[in-house]
Structures are given as structure tokens and as C-alpha cells.
A protein has these predicted regions:
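Short linear sequence elements within intrinsically disordered, low-complexity coil regions
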Residues: 10-13, 335
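C-terminal motif of bacterial Sec signal peptides marking the signal peptidase cleavage site
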Residues: 15-18
Length: 346
């Protein structure tokens, strides 16, 4: 959630006509990388509009993969790996987005729907991967709250349907099992857990059955996807993480290893942790290069597989909350360049 003048609030000193600027909080030093690709600005200008990306990988032709990004005021965009817009689906009020392959060679896209601020809803669409177009596929009402975070996972072996986790504004974490019958999607929801304050970032690791949730002003929670047992694994410390904690993403390696990445929005950085122990590895920023730098990031996405010659060892996408003088957009970064900058073991 972008906060105006984050880190630059003016504080009255109680002296007539006098005030002082509070310096922004800056975390530990961060290495820098640059974006290889950017999308066009979203259609909503001069507002906090672009929010969250998702990646669909074309296994047969990785360079022909697609990404989906939200404009909270307008709807869903589909882009290719050159950043070109493939399509747009009007659907105002959407926030976070995720996608997953489902039977029949189809791709289900789900976004948290904030058009009703009293009820968490899941907006569903099917992605035609040949044309890059989205077709609406209904809504599922989840429960009370204002929808923010959303992430999906396929159930463990033998399970049916798709599991969607919702992280609304109030801190309740919902678990919805989505099934399809006769072309209609329905959901059965239970409450998985509760954290004290506002959440948003959401990523599920099916290897360990762990759901990672970002509590914006507290840190990152690891939650058992079945029992709801939780523990705070990375607290905001103004070193590795500076509030708000926003988007979360993982790059899995092996049985339970890899990396967890979090948007440290308060100082325009990204914190990287080693899995499975969520041990801090380092921080990076996206600096000015062929494209502009990236600030005030909400959503991120990461896939460490091959995406063709432009992104041969993985793709990291960040929402750019500034992108001046244009409207907000999304920027693509080579994941191997992030790891090289961090001098991460490979």
C-alpha cells in the first residue's frame, strides 16, 4: 500500500511557523541491478494504480511467456516478455493477482476484488495463452474484509481443486478451496489464521506447506497451510526490512531451499532471504539504467526458470510506484543478475 510522502512526514516542533523534515529511514546497504524491460504505463495516471504482477511460463517456448499486471482503478493487463501490451480486461477494484495452470491446458487468473470494501471477493478470469486475452470466469465471495493479498497453490498429492489464500486488510487469513464443475468455479472457505494488523504480500511454498504473509508494519509470517500455526520469521528492523513490507515472492531450489524476496517499500529496496530458514542474504535496488529506477514497490513476482534468451535464468518483476513523469508500470529484471550482485551461492 503506497503511502504518500512515506518517510518524509513533516513534524511540528511546537515553534510558531517552524517545522523540521524527518529524514527517511534507510536500511542496510543494498546492491543495485537495472531493468532489462519495462511495460507501458498503466492507463490510470497521477494515481496509485499499478499494483501486482503474475507470470505465466510457456514451457514449450519460454520466450513466449506472458505476464499479468493489475491497475487497481481499471483492470488487468497482459504483457509479453518484451513488455508489450497484449490485452486489457476492464475490471475496476482489483488489487493483487496470481495465476495457475489448471486441467485442459488452461490458465486460471485470480485477483483480489475490492469493489465491495466489506467483503473479500475473488475475481476470476481464464487466460488464452495463444492470444494473450482474458475472459471473465466469475467471482467467489470469501468472507468479511477488504481484499488485498492473494496467492494460490495446488493441493498436496491426492487433493482436489486449487487452494487460494486471501490476506485482507484486517489481518484475517482465509483459505479457499476452489473447484470447477460444468465450467463454473465455486469455493469453500475457512479461516486459516489471524495476524494483528494489515497484511498484503502473500506467497505459498507447496514444498514445505508454508504460507508466507507480509504484515505491513510488522514483518513476514510463516504460516502452516494446513493448521494455521504461525511464527514471525523476519521482523521489520529498519535494517533488512523497512516498513511497509509489501510484495513477496520465492525462487525455489531443491527440496526446501532457494530464496524468499520481499519488497521493503519504505526505503525502495528488496530484501532477500535464504530458504528454508529465512536467513537474511542481502538487499538490492533497481537503479537507473536503460530504463528508470524503481521506487515504492507494491507487488513483485519471481520465477527462476528459463525464459528464453532475454531471461535465461529467471525473471523478477517489480511494480514501479513512481515511474515519473509517466503513470506507474512494471519493470523486468534478470534474476541471475540479482544473484550475481548479491554474490549468492549458485
Amino acid at each position: 500500500m503506497l503511502r504518500a510522502f512515506h518517510g518524509f512526514a513533516l513534524v511540528s516542533l511546537g515553534i510558531a511557523g517552524g517545522c523540521a523534515t524527518v529524514p527517511p529511514i534507510m536500511g542496510d546497504p543494498a546492491v543495485t541491478v537495472t531493468a532489462r524491460v519495462e511495460t507501458p504505463p498503466v492507463g490510470t495516471a497521477r494515481e496509485d494504480a499499478a499494483d501486482d504482477p503474475a507470470i505465466w511460463r510457456n514451457a514449450a517456448n519460454p520466450a513466449a511467456s506472458l505476464t499479468v499486471g493489475t491497475d487497481k482503478k481499471a483492470g488487468l493487463y497482459v504483457y509479453d516478455l518484451k513488455g508489450a501490451q497484449k490485452s486489457f480486461l476492464a475490471a475496476p477494484g482489483l488489487n493483487n493477482v496470481d495465476l495457475i495452470d489448471i486441467p485442459g491446458g488452461r490458465v486460471l487468473v485470480i485477483a483480489s476484488d475490492r469493489s465491495d470494501l466489506a467483503t473479500v471477493n475473488l475475481f476470476m478470469a481464464l487466460l488464452d495463452t495463444a492470444t494473450g486475452k482474458l475472459a471473465p470466469a466469475g467471482k467467489i465471495a470469501v468472507g468479511p474484509g477488504e481484499g488485498y493479498g492473494i496467492c494460490m497453490v495446488k493441493p498436496a498429492r491426492g487433493g482436489e481443486g486449487i487452494i487460494a489464500f486471501s490476506a485482507p486488510k484486517g489481518g484475517t487469513i482465509y483459505r479457499t478451496v476452489i473447484r470447477e464443475a460444468g465450467g463454473v468455479f465455486t469455493g469453500t472457505t475457512t479461516t486459516l489464521a489471524q495476524v494483528p494488523t494489515q497484511t498484503e504480500g502473500c506467497i505459498a511454498d507447496p514444498r514445505t506447506g508454508t504460507l508466507f504473509i507480509g504484515e505491513e508494519d510488522a514483518g513476514i509470517w510463516a504460516i502452516d497451510m494446513t493448521t494455521g500455526a504461525k511464527r514471525l520469521v523476519a521482523a521489520i528492523d529498519n535494517k533488512v526490512l523497512v516498513a511497509d513490507v509489501e510484495g513477496l515472492a520465492i525462487a525455489p531450489e531443491g527440496k526446501d531451499g532457494g530464496y524468499l524476496v520481499a519488497s521493503s517499500q519504505g526505503d525502495n529496496a528488496y530484501a532477500v532471504f535464504r530458504l528454508p530458514d529465512v536467513t537474511p542474504l542481502g538487499r538490492f535496488r533497481i537503479a537507473q539504467g536503460a530504463f528508470g529506477s524503481v521506487e515504492e514497490t507494491d507487488g513483485i513476482e519471481l520465477d527462476n526458470r528459463d525464459f528464453g534468451p532475454d531471461f535465461p535464468n529467471g525473471l523478477f518483476i517489480a511494480q514501479d510506484g513512481v515511474n515519473a513523469p509517466s503513470a506507474q508500470n512494471f519493470k523486468y529484471v534478470r534474476w541471475d543478475e540479482v544473484l550475481a550482485a548479491l554474490e549468492a551461492p549458485r
